[in-house]
Amino acid sequence: MSRVAKNPVILPAGVEAKFTAAEIVVKGPLGQLAMPLNAGVEVRLEDNALKFAAKDESKASRSMSGTMRALVNNMVTGVSKGFERKLQLVGVGYRAQAQGAALNLTLGFSHPVVHPMPEGVAVETPSQTEIILKGVDKQKVGQVAAEIRAYRAPEPYKGKGVRYAGEQVVLKETKKK
């Protein structure tokens, strides 16, 4: 059995989970998330906790039981607390501005970069060099953060670019004559 799948997913107050043979739906105060269930994984609801187990002893089923448990745990956390990802803009003239369902970025290109926000991800810009992404789906929030960072990843000599909050950029030394 997967070591991750051994631990049950405890449902906090206000969060409920419903599942069929095909999918699992988790509802909470912040929203609702659904995900298809793997055919090799068995899910049981026992006293407000979801338990995962492999249906057979194949390596794929054992592996997927741990994966499903981790994904459902992220869904439960998302609908109860939500997820947040912070980005910082480092560089002269690098600015960000939230405009409705889009993010306007000035990143040293000859044109402004407009990144549309997908449904379920909210963006805030407390300052011109700070971006905060919020949502209930951890994968979606992380994907949007990675897409924004990819417009201008931190370069290795001065560290200019878009970086995650707390990210350590290793700077290279310049060439010596």
From Swiss-Prot:
Q: Which domain of life is it from?
A: Bacteria
Q: Does the keyword Ribonucleoprotein apply?
A: yes
One molecular function GO term is:
rRNA binding
The protein's matches in PROSITE patterns, at most eight in alphabetical order, are given as:
RIBOSOMAL_L6_1
A cellular-component GO term for this protein: cytosolic large ribosomal subunit
Gene3D superfamilies, per database record:
Ribosomal protein L6, alpha-beta domain
Q: What does this protein do?
A: This protein binds to the 23S rRNA, and is important in its secondary structure. It is located near the subunit interface in the base of the L7/L12 stalk, and near the tRNA binding site of the peptidyltransferase center.
| Similarity comment text for this entry | Belongs to the universal ribosomal protein uL6 family.
Kindly provide the name given to this protein in its UniProt entry.
Answer: Large ribosomal subunit protein uL6
The organism encoding this protein is Laribacter hongkongensis (strain HLHK9)
- Point out the gene that encodes the protein: rplF
